[in-house]
Amino acid sequence: MTEHLKQKLNDSAVLRWSVLALVAFTMLCGYFLTDVMSPLKPMLEKELLWDSLDYGFFTSAYGWFNVFLLMLIFGGIILDKMGVRFTGIGACLLMVFGCGLKYYAISTTFPEGAMLFGFKTQVTLAALGYAIFGVGVEIAGITVSKIIVKWFKGKEMALAMGLEMATARIGTTLAMVLTVPLADFFGCLLYTSPSPRDQRGS
């Protein structure tokens, strides 16, 4: 009965392409947030007094858990055992939590000289958030692939995968084009407290 219902749902072109639009938009947001800090590097150096070592440490965090803790492999196992709904929701929650931690780190002024694991506390917390986000977005990527395989068959499958990847990469383009204008419009990096530069000048 369940398989029959799934087959009926798959037969609906409207539902198939709506599902594709939903998962493609999710990955667009994921790719946008993956690359959103890259155009802000000069602003991070100017406003938060980051240096290239800090920024390099931060960007390396994306692969910490995925590479050294084999989270993509575990994510695939969870996907096979628990299904796309559980894994997809879990991946999105990791993305949201990671982004929230990164935003907290960037928007909070920590005491000057505060260090954590050899780096500024702000940098370390932002990197940790980025690492958690990286797990979420990569697991979301493999979940999306399985969703497409479930909903599309034959010649439509390759087209669906191509459209999903193309849409996701629009997120990277939007990050490069919109991030700096948005930061300028909202006032630097949406600070809720004075930046280290302002504190140093006062």
Residue ranges and their predicted role:
Residues 18-19, 25-44:
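Extracytoplasmic
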Residues 60-76:
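Central cavity-lining transmembrane alpha-helices of secondary-active solute carriers
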Residues 93-118:
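C-terminal ends and interior cores of transmembrane alpha-helices
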Residues 113-138:
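Hydrophobic core of transmembrane alpha-helices in multi-pass small-molecule transporters
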Residues 131-166:
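Cytoplasmic helix-loop-helix junction between adjacent transmembrane helices
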Residues 162-176:
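Glycine-rich segments within core transmembrane alpha-helices of 12-TM secondary carriers
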Residues 191-198:
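Conserved small/polar residues in nucleotide/adenosyl-binding loops
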